[in-house]
């Protein structure tokens, strides 16, 4: 490409800049994406630990007792215990609060500082859990883990979106989701192994959460900060040199000027939380709220949190329940590669819509199989064939999520906010995600006890609603530079009424279309 040239790209009217994909930016994004290991490891570890007999005997003897003595005459209510659910869900309540603190630190001190705080809090929380002697220590550890997750999830997707060139931003950003799936799979494998230990297997499972935390802490020292963040803090020359380095080009004037324009606009914003409520930011506000809500209401964390518990509820043995969780973890990780391949080739909308249809069908089928075997009484049994079918459809469901709502739930909110509201937008994204993750974690086992197999129909109906929402209201953002999202909203049939002309930056583009 000739020096200084830029061309229009499909998928929303944005343009690409000079420079290509460098080994430096790929390595940087890989290290940063390890922040997803924090989230993924915890998602995978808690369900396996809460199904371990030694753990239940020590901390939740009433649950272990009701399982052994079969006090409940329904399989649906076998694990229904609020304190047990609080062990899982408390992390996400802390993450919700931490995400708001992280947004301020991310803006004032850079993305790296937030990533460091996240890793350190997660490390301390892992040690609390590994050496816990009572439920209070467990909950304190989980709250510290939540602070780590809140900071990491607020800063890492923003960091990835700002470092990556627009044409591969989707693939590199999905590295965060890939790290989450790797963390889930590793946690499932560790749970399967530690369940064989005579003693303290649960301590090993919880303590090994320190490993991704150490990676995050070390990575935060190694990584450079983003040009966007440097400009926000007045380091213009350093920002330009970093932009040249990550783009592998000497002439980055057009992109650098757009970044400067965005930073100047951001400096005029004294309160991003107030400004994000303005009408011109309405699309970003809606999607930063709706996408994480819908992501959680798919029911995916029913599988991620409680896979071993769910499979034991349905009559799988201890080994079979843990191995089934490993299988879903493998499917989750491998399916994420589909998204990495497809997101910048076929766009975000196609993956959202296909994944939604796939999840809807699978939720209906799983609910129907469970209803046919257990009915409303919950006193039936699973045949091996039925168990295999349920596991198969859960795997297809997980695959649909893993190449659509899983990675895109983090990617799209991180790429649609202009710089002046980006920390606030990402904080909303993370906090809404964490709030509904908390609700699912805290009340799923109770909902299963009361709604029985109908719970899967409930999740299916939510998937149908969110798929229609995406079809009508989300424009394609493939190949659109972050600072040019105003053009995309301005061209959309519904959102254009909220976007004034002066909200579109980059006036030196001759290829603007209406």
From Swiss-Prot:
Keyword Coiled coil listed: no
Induction: Induced under low-glucose conditions in pollen tubes. Down-regulated by glucose.
Pfam families attached to this UniProt entry: Sugar_tr
Any GO MF annotation of the entry: galactose transmembrane transporter activity
Alphabetized CDD domains for the sequence: MFS_STP (cd17361)
Primary localization: membrane
Record-annotated membrane-spanning stretches: 19-39, 86-106, 113-133, 135-155, 170-190, 204-224, 285-305, 320-340, 350-370, 389-409, 428-448, 453-473
Disulfide bonds: 77-449
Positions that bind beta-D-glucose: 177, 295-296, 301, 332, 410
Catalytic activity: D-glucose(out) + H(+)(out) = D-glucose(in) + H(+)(in); D-mannose(out) + H(+)(out) = D-mannose(in) + H(+)(in); D-galactose(in) + H(+)(in) = D-galactose(out) + H(+)(out)
Gene Ontology cellular-component annotations: plasma membrane
Sequence ranges on the Cytoplasmic membrane side: 1-18, 474-514
Localization terms from the record: Membrane
Similarity field: Belongs to the major facilitator superfamily. Sugar transporter (TC 2.A.1.1) family.
Function: Hexose-H(+) symporter that catalyzes the high-affinity uptake of glucose, galactose and mannose. Proton-coupled symporter responsible for the uptake of glucose from the apoplast into the cells.
Protein name per its UniProtKB record: Sugar transport protein 10
Organism whose genome encodes this protein: Arabidopsis thaliana (Mouse-ear cress)
């Amino acid at each position: 490409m000739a020096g200084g040239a830029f061309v229009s790209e499909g998928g929303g009217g944005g343009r690409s800049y000079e420079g290509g994909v460098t080994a430096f930016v790929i390595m940087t994004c890989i290290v940063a994406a390890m922040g997803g290991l924090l989230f993924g490891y915890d998602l995978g570890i808690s369900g396996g630990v809460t199904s371990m007999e030694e753990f239940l005997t020590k901390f939740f003897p009433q649950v272990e007792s009701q399982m052994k003595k079969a006090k409940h005459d329904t399989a649906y209510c076998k694990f229904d215990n609020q304190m047990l659910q609080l062990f899982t869900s408390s992390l996400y309540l802390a993450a919700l609060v931490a995400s708001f603190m992280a947004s301020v630190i991310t803006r004032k001190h850079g993305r790296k500082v937030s990533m460091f705080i996240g890793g350190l809090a997660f490390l301390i929380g892992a040690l609390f859990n590994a050496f816990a002697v009572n439920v209070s220590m467990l909950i304190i550890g989980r709250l510290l883990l939540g602070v780590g997750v809140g900071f990491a999830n607020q800063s890492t997707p923003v960091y990835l979106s700002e470092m990556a060139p627009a044409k591969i931003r989707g693939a590199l950003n999905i590295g965060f989701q890939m790290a989450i799936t790797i963390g889930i799979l590793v946690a499932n494998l560790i749970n399967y192994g530690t369940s064989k230990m005579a003693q303290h297997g649960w301590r090993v499972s919880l303590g090994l959460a320190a490993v991704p935390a150490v990676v995050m802490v070390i990575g935060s020292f190694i990584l450079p900060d983003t040009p966007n963040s440097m400009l926000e803090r007045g380091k213009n020359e350093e920002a330009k040199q970093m932009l040249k380095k990550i783009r592998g080009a000497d002439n980055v004037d057009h992109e650098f000027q757009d970044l400067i324009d965005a930073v100047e606009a951001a400096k005029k914003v004294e309160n991003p939380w107030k400004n994000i409520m303005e009408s011109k930011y309405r699309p970003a506000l809606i999607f930063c709220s709706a996408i994480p809500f819908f992501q959680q209401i798919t029911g995916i964390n029913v599988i991620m949190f409680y896979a071993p518990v769910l499979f034991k509820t349905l009559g799988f043995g201890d080994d079979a329940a843990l191995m089934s969780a490993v299988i879903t973890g493998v499917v989750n990780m491998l399916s994420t590669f589909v998204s990495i391949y497809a997101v910048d080739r076929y766009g975000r909308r196609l993956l959202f819509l296909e994944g939604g249809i796939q999840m809807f069908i699978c939720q209906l089928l799983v609910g129907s199989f469970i209803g046919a075997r257990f009915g409303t009484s919950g006193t039936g049994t699973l045949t091996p064939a039925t168990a295999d079918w349920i596991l198969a459809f859960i795997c297809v469901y997980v695959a649909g999520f893993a190449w659509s709502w899983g990675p895109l739930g983090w990617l799209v909110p991180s790429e649609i906010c202009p710089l002046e509201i980006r920390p606030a937008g990402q904080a909303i994204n993370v906090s809404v995600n964490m709030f509904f993750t908390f609700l699912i974690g805290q009340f799923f086992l109770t909902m299963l006890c009361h709604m029985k197999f109908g719970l899967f129909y409930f999740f299916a109906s939510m998937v149908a609603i969110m798929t229609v929402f995406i079809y009508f209201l989300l424009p394609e953002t493939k190949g659109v530079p972050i600072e040019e999202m105003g053009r995309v909203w301005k061209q959309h049939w519904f959102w254009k009424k909220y976007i004034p002309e002066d909200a579109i930056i980059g006036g030196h583009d001759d290829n603007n279309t209406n």
